[in-house]
Amino acid sequence: WMYQGEPVDTIPEEYVGFVYEITNTTTGRKYIGKKLVQFKRSRPPLKGRKNKRRYKVESDWREYYGSSDALTEDIEQLGQQNFSREILFWCRNKAELSYIEAREQFARKVLESDEYYNGHIRVRVHGAGLNKK
């Protein structure tokens, strides 16, 4: 992953995820998406307790190449070396993550152009999670 021209090995602690762009360097076709850095998992409660035990697990963000079927197919055919992965925005919460992903997809008109792998835009955001200016 790259961010502003620099390689990314670790995610800053204050961010929950990022909005990214994957580019096919042979055709120029792109994909806009989002990725969470950690997932919440739960274990069954301990004996005699009712509440589940929750813990966090790091996601597969280091190896991730998007969820589009067409993109995955091209990556298998052309190889990962023909794709660049760039982080566009760091996000502090899930609402901001979903909002910025959808905002970028609408602004770039990803559904109206064959230049993008994106096949649909799915978003559900509550305004309370956004930092309003």
Regions found by a protein language model. Give the residues of each.
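Structure-specific nucleic-acid interaction/processing domains
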Residues: 1-133
